[in-house]
Swiss-Prot record:
Gene symbol of the encoding locus: glgS
Family classification: Belongs to the GlgS family.
GO biological processes: negative regulation of bacterial-type flagellum-dependent cell motility; negative regulation of single-species biofilm formation
Function recorded in the entry: Major determinant of cell surface composition. Negatively regulates motility, adhesion and synthesis of biofilm exopolysaccharides.
Cysteines joined through disulfide linkages: none
Protein name: Surface composition regulator
Native source species: Escherichia coli O45:K1 (strain S88 / ExPEC)
Length: 66
């Protein structure tokens, strides 16, 4: 099993979950979430989190238009 790929899948799931929480108006402290990550993983995680936040906001805007 590729542990690196598994770790990225886990980080992606967490980024999506925290972005969903943010979209629901729940407080998310990304600095606390990423505090123990090394720089490479933190950068990747924050980019994925930002991407998911953007996607969820666009989805919400489309839902409000219809």
């Amino acid at each position: 099993m590729d542990h690196s790929l598994n770790s990225l899948n886990n980080f992606d799931f967490l980024a999506r979950s925290f972005a969903r929480m943010h979209a629901e108006g729940r407080p998310v402290d990304i600095l606390a979430v990423t505090g123990n990550m090394d720089e490479e993983h933190r950068t990747w995680f924050c980019a994925r989190y930002a991407w998911y936040c953007q996607q969820m906001m666009q989805t919400r805007e489309l839902e409000l238009e219809h």
